[in-house]
Every structure is written in structure tokens, then in C-alpha cells.
């Protein structure tokens, strides 16, 4: 996957869903890797990431940046990804940044509403115009979903296994379906829009019920 020329070597990690992924930005190219099923839940996941870097000829000390998807999503997954990134950065010059995982579901020149299950009969919503935030994360009740998304916005969710039918009922043809936030797409944002990177990243928590694992 090609990019505009970029000299930084960047590792991007997203563990906000059951489909967990990494991507390496090197020499203007994005190299993705997806861990699913047992690979995603395995305790040796950090070793698999190190093996992935080695397969691309990159030592942890050669990384310039590490970017982590901040969620919303799996409490354990996001925390583990941040801890891994901070540990990997120790003893190197790599900087650790964050991006909301929902940015992986945006597209250039498209208005997108990302809706997720916050549990306890609440749903989180965030609105984007391209990669730019129109309205940051906010919580709504089920009966408020219809009015939460303005006309002209397509609706997507990373939580299709839980709320796909609900969103179809509320949004009809505006509902574009379930999408998985992948590190490769976050890498595109990180390189194309470095101004969006967040230093000293923390997980996006909307309420305790967002913790999914």
C-alpha cells in the first residue's frame, strides 16, 4: 500500500476489537498484519508483533513513532496496546501517539457517523467530515439515535455483531454497515494528517460499560 513520501518508520497498533491489527510504515509504504481468533487473544501477541517487525527488517530501536488506536472498544485490548507501545518505546527514541480507532472508519471527502454500543442502553456517536471531527464522542439513548445523526451522514459501526439490526432499523439506507477499524487505515491517517496525532494517549472511555473485555 503506497503513501506519499515519508521518512519516518512508524508502528501502528489497534486492539479495540476482536480483529486486532498492526501496520508498519516504512519507506513510504504501509505493511499490514491482522491477528484474528486465537492469534488476537494469545498471551504471546507482543512476540508476534516483534516477529512481524523482524520480518520487515525493523528492530524496535529503529522505530520513530508508535501510534495506538485509543478506541472506544475493548478495555483490556486498548490498555494492553498502550502498555506494549510504551514498553517498546523505552530505550529508544520512538514517540508514542494515539488516534481514535474510529478514524480508521473515515474516508476522504465523506461525511460519516460512527455509532457504537456503550452498553447500559447507551450508544456512543461521533461525526466526521473526512478525517476531521464535526462532533466528538457523545452518548445517546436508543430513542435518541434517530436525531443524533444529521442528514447527509452515512452511518457505520465497529459493533455490528451487537447493534447491526438496531442501526438498520433506525437509519435505513443511510446505514452503510459494520466496519472493522484496522491499523493500516490508521496508518494512512497518521501519515496524511500528523496534526491529528495525540501525545500522551489514553483510552477513549465514555462510561464503564464501554469496557468490552
For each feature predicted by the language model, list its residue ranges.
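Oxyanion-binding and handling regions
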Residues: 1-30, 36, 40-44, 97-213
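A generic, residue-level signal for flexible/boundary positions that often mark functional hotspots
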Residues: 52-53, 69, 93-96, 195, ...
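Generic structural marker for isolated residues within well-ordered, non-membrane alpha-helices
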Residues: 49, 85, 164
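Phosphate/pyrophosphate-binding loops at sites that engage ATP/ADP/AMP, CoA/4′-phosphopantetheine
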Residues: 49-65, 148-153
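DPxDG-like acidic metal-binding loop motif
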Residues: 65-95
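Phosphate-handling active-site elements
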Residues: 57-61, 90-99
